[in-house]
C-alpha cells in the first residue's frame, strides 16, 4: 500500500536493516544506544529547531494522505474516530490505557535490556534550550498520530475491505508495529507487538482511534520528558 510505503512500512525496513547492523556489531546490544530525539545541528539552536519542526511536519504528510483517501471514498477522519466529537471520553480512556501500559512497558524494557535483548534506548539527547520540552511534546504527539491513524485505523479498514479476517488483521497490524521498533532490539519488537495487539482490540471495541492517540501521546511524553528529567539522576534508568 502506498501509504505504508511512504511511512511506517518503509520505517520497518529501515529498522530491520538497523537491527542487523546492531546485531552484527562487536559487543552486546545493551552496550549500544538507540536515540529517538537527537540534535540535527549541534551548537546551532535555531537551525536545530528549524530541522526539528521540519521533521515533525513532514512526518505528518502520510496522515494527510490518509485523510484525502478517506474523503475520496466518501468517508473522512470521523469514520475512524479521529475527530473532536467525544474529547472527554477519548481523553479518559486514553489516560487509563496509558496508565495500564506505561509501568508494564518500562519494566519489560529494563528486563529486556538487562538480559541483553535490547539496546539502551535514549529517548532524547537534545541540547538544554528553551524549545527542548515543547519539541519533545510535539514529537510525542506526531509519533502517536502517525502510528495510530495509519497502523491501526487505516490499515484495519483497508484489510477489512480486502476481506481479511479480524485475526489476520490483528497479526498484521501488531507485527508491523513491532517491526518498525526493531531498531531498539528484540525487546522493542516484542513489547510494541504486544502493545499493538492491545490497541487493535481496543479499536475494534470502541471504534475510535482517538483514545489510542491520547494513550500513545501520554506514553511518549512520559518517556521523552521523563528521561530528560531523570537521566543520570536515578540509578535504575539506563544511560549510554
What is the role of each PLM region?
Residues 30-32, 44, 72, 78, ...:
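Arginine residue identity/basic-tract feature
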Amino acid at each position: 500500500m502506498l501509504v505504508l510505503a511512504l511511512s511506517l512500512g518503509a520505517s520497518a525496513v529501515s529498522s530491520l536493516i538497523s537491527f542487523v547492523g546492531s546485531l552484527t556489531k562487536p559487543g552486546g546490544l545493551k552496550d549500544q544506544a538507540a536515540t529517538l530525539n537527537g540534535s540535527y545541528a549541534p551548537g546551532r539552536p535555531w537551525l536545530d529547531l528549524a530541522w526539528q519542526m521540519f521533521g515533525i511536519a513532514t512526518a505528518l504528510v502520510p496522515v494527510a494522505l490518509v485523510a484525502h483517501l478517506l474523503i475520496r471514498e466518501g468517508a473522512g477522519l470521523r469514520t475512524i474516530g479521529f475527530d473532536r466529537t467525544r474529547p472527554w471520553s477519548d481523553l479518559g480512556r486514553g489516560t487509563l490505557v496509558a496508565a495500564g501500559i506505561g509501568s508494564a512497558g518500562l519494566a519489560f524494557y529494563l528486563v529486556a535490556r538487562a538480559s541483553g535483548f535490547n539496546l539502551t534506548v535514549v529517548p532524547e539527547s537534545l541540547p538544554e534550550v528553551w524549545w527542548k520540552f515543547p519539541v519533545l511534546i510535539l514529537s510525542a504527539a506526531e509519533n502517536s498520530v502517525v502510528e495510530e491513524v495509519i497502523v491501526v485505523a487505516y490499515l484495519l479498514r483497508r484489510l477489512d475491505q480486502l476481506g481479511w479476517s479480524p485475526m489476520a488483521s490483528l497479526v498484521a497490524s501488531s507485527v508491523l508495529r513491532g517491526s518498525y521498533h526493531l531498531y531498539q532490539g528484540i525487546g522493542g519488537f516484542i513489547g510494541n507487538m504486544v502493545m499493538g495487539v492491545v490497541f487493535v482490540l481496543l479499536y475494534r471495541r470502541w471504534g475510535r482511534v482517538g483514545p489510542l492517540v491520547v494513550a500513545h501521546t501520554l506514553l511518549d511524553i512520559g518517556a521523552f520528558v521523563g528521561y530528560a528529567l531523570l537521566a543520570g539522576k536515578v540509578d535504575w534508568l539506563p544511560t549510554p
